From Swiss-Prot:
The lineage of its organism: Archaea, Methanobacteriati, Methanobacteriota, Thermococci, Thermococcales. This is Large ribosomal subunit protein uL30. One of its GO terms (cellular component) is cytosolic large ribosomal subunit. CDD domains: Ribosomal_L7_archeal_euk. Keywords: Ribonucleoprotein, Ribosomal protein. Belongs to the universal ribosomal protein uL30 family. SUPFAM superfamilies: Ribosomal protein L30p/L7e.
């Protein structure tokens, strides 16, 4: 089962209530926040409902490892370190990321890891309008494997 990275692009002004509730269920309360979700029909329906405020795509293990290492936070706003992951799970961050992508483990298996990654705005900008879909040259909606390039620019 693939994992999807979901990033909130647009703010909270004039958001309709059902979309606002969906974004809250996805834990995307602020712009440039990222969550990792499973590729299931229920999540895909939620993403489709909020498609005018978010972008998403399939994340790979290498990008997930960088995301955990650089932007992962533990309760108390402490960074996730190799030593912490080794102590709790007995593996490196890269091995953990690979197991998460393969579906053998979940991000919840790492104790005290916050479910939301707070990202920097993309270096070089969104390369298009924040109000148009990715297919139309904008930043919103499904972008497939290209989500990895966006996350790299936001780390």
């Amino acid at each position: 089962m693939a994992k999807l990275a979901v990033i909130r692009i647009r703010g909270r002004v004039n958001v309709k209530r059902p979309v606002r509730d969906t974004l809250a269920m996805l834990r995307l309360h602020r712009v440039n926040h990222c969550v990792i979700v499973d590729d299931t029909p229920s999540y895909l329906g939620m993403l489709q409902k909020a498609k005018d405020y978010i972008t998403w795509g399939e994340i790979n293990a290498e990008t997930l490892a960088k995301l955990i290492r650089k932007r992962g936070r533990l309760i108390g706003n402490k960074p996730v370190t190799d030593e912490y992951v080794k102590e709790k799970l007995g593996m490196t961050i890269e091995e953990f990321a690979q197991k998460v992508i393969n579906g053998e483990m979940s991000l919840k298996d790492l104790p005290n890891l916050k479910p939301v990654f707070r990202l920097h705005p993309p270096r070089g900008g969104f390369r298009g309008s924040k109000k148009r879909s990715f297919k139309e040259g904008g930043a919103l909606g499904y972008r497939g494997e290209k989500i990895n390039d966006l996350i790299e620019r936001m780390l």
